[in-house]
Regions:
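Conserved N-terminal phosphate-binding loop of PLP-dependent enzymes in the Aspartate aminotransferase
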Residues: 1-196
Length: 196
């Protein structure tokens, strides 16, 4: 495909490895290369609930500013579970693009959204209508869920903190089989020493 013809290259970076991150940005922002975007999740549930550190995210966003590289925060799983509604707010960053979905429309209407900052939102009004219409239902589901999430943010945070605290307590009491607790609040995972 495109990668075989030298037109693009997708480059993964180890989570929380700031040295590798810096090396990749240095390598791919010179000569014939230019980073097109930095895609990331804050908590990678498919990787044992690995959580990107504050330091790593701050460094990544600084490199993106330096190299004029858009940031794309995948908030499909994390949004609404944060008392700040979006996890990026907890990290103190503002992505160029945020992708939301799953729980955000409250389970009432299956829909995902891509939110752009003003610099990247260049489509004219109605420039990207969907084929089958009915976007007003999805939009309403999002707005209702957003209002509910804002009204219940304190409870969401408290329940999530309690859940994480209880998981960490469980891990400390059962350190034989349990290696660690990863993630944050509702989005947490239990790592075992063995899967025996």
């Amino acid at each position: 495909g495109l990668e075989n013809h030298g037109l693009l290259r997708v480059r993964g970076v180890r989570p929380n490895d700031e040295k590798e991150l810096e090396a990749v940005f240095a390598e791919y922002n010179q000569g014939r290369y230019k980073t097109a975007a930095f895609f990331h999740e804050f908590i990678m549930m498919n990787y044992g609930a690995a959580r990107l550190t504050d330091s790593y995210i701050r460094r990544a966003y600084a490199l993106c500013r330096k190299h004029d590289t858009p940031t794309v925060a995948d908030e499909i799983q994390t949004c609404v579970w944060s008392p700040e509604i979006f996890m990026f707010r907890e990290y103190g960053v503002t992505p160029s693009i945020a992708v939301v979905g799953k729980g955000f429309p409250g389970g009432e209407y299956p829909a995902s959204r891509i939110l752009f900052n003003a610099a990247l939102d260049t489509l004219p009004l109605f420039g990207a209508l969907v084929t089958n219409g009915q976007e007003e239902l999805a939009s309403l589901a999002y707005l209702v869920t957003l209002r509910w999430a804002e009204a219940n943010a304190e409870v969401t945070g408290a329940v999530g903190d309690y859940y994480e605290e209880r998981l960490r307590d469980l891990a400390s009491r059962h350190s034989g089989p349990l290696a660690s607790i990863e993630g944050r609040r509702h989005l947490a995972g239990i790592n075992f020493h063995e899967l025996g």
